[in-house]
């Protein structure tokens, strides 16, 4: 999807990718009348919408994440397609972990959510150069992977799955509140591990 056969700026290509993925998930769930699929989609969508705040904070306040001009409009300092982009990894983590829970056990499902978060977000960070945003002024592993954000993203993936299981049958307004809590967990973890790794550990090396 990033290699579109006609000239488009990377921001528009990413918007098309995000829109296509979101419509594909929702459409499949509706056509198949897959209630748990639809519930998971909307829960991670709420989280993704709120994730604009951590991205905005990291880019505007800490200045360690850059969203350059990529041809798509911004919300603050963040490209607006990010509102739906977090759906992609979070839905994959949640759906696979749900299947593992059905086949094995809840403990193995929790472990899978942690491992999937590490793998998916780790690969995403490592391949960030393909996209339009990038980290700056932080310690990088293999030239692309920002160390400080690894644990916060694992917390994000695991807490999304864990809290979805706990509250999947609640009213939608309650799920929105829980999604906001997930965002706060991620934002707090990102802040803490940035301070710990960049200002304490790396500074003292």
Predicted features and spans:
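Aromatic-rich, lipid-facing transmembrane alpha helices and their immediate juxtamembrane interface loops
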Residues: 1-205
């Amino acid at each position: 999807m990033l290699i579109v056969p006609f000239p488009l700026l990377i921001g528009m290509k990413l918007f098309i990718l995000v829109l296509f993925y979101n419509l594909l998930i929702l459409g499949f769930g509706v056509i198949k009348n897959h209630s748990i699929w639809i519930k998971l989609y909307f829960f991670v969508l709420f989280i993704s919408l709120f994730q604009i705040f951590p991205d905005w904070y990291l880019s505007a306040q800490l200045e360690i994440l850059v969203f350059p001009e990529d041809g798509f409009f911004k919300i603050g300092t963040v490209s607006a397609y990010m509102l739906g982009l977090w759906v992609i990894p979070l839905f994959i983590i949640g759906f696979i972990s749900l299947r593992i829970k059905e086949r094995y056990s809840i403990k193995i499902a929790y472990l899978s959510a942690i491992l999937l978060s590490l793998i998916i977000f780790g690969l995403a960070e490592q391949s960030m150069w393909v996209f339009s945003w990038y980290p700056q002024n932080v310690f990088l592993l293999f030239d692309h992977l920002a160390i400080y954000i690894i644990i916060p993203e694992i917390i994000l993936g695991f807490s999304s799955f864990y809290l979805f299981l706990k509250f999947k049958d609640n009213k939608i307004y309650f799920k929105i509140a829980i999604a906001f809590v997930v965002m706060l967990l991620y934002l707090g973890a990102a802040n803490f591990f940035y301070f710990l790794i960049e200002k304490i550990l790396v500074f003292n090396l």
